[in-house]
Structures are given as C-alpha cells and as structure tokens.
C-alpha cells in the first residue's frame, strides 16, 4: 500500500520525509522516493527496495538543507517495481505523487501525446 508524506517548514525536509516514510513501512511497499526543493530546482531521488536504500542514496548525495519536499512509498499496481516507476514523478518545476490507480490514464496519455508530450 502506498504512503505519502509532505513537509514545509524550518527543519530538514529530507530528515522529516525519511522519518515519516519510516513510520509508514508497516504498510508494505516495493520502492520509495523523495522530491526536495533546491535553489536550482527540484531534486528527485528514488530507489527500488527498502527505505534504507533510499536513505543511503541521499547520504551519498549530501544535498543542501531544504525545508520543503514530498516523499512516497509505492506498492506497484501498474508497472514493475523499479527506480523509474517509483514516485515522485517530476518535471523541472513540479513533482507529484499519488496513491491508487488512475483509471483514465489511457485517455489522458492520448491527450498529452497529441499536445507533443513524450513518454
């Protein structure tokens, strides 16, 4: 089952998000990720597997302190568990996470492809 954590404040968003996702581990998941604002945009870090893998990736990156971000744990319902399929999904300006199945994904994808978006 998926879990979502968001934070805006004075503390380290990275730490708050990881702590929050840790509290949701009992729900089960196959991948995890975070999107954290940075001066030059949004930094997204995702990983298949346990939260400890995501935590290790973040420690290696040593991102600058930020007070804003979102985190997600995913239980795959569409697409295999992978770094690519993990949430958050992002552009340079926005990151999103969601729980559940987007029933009309086919129609939405067709509209976006017609507008020039690629998948």
Summary of predicted features, one role per range:
Residues 1-114:
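N-terminal glutamine amidotransferase
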Residues 115-119:
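Contiguous alpha-helical scaffold segments within structured protein domains
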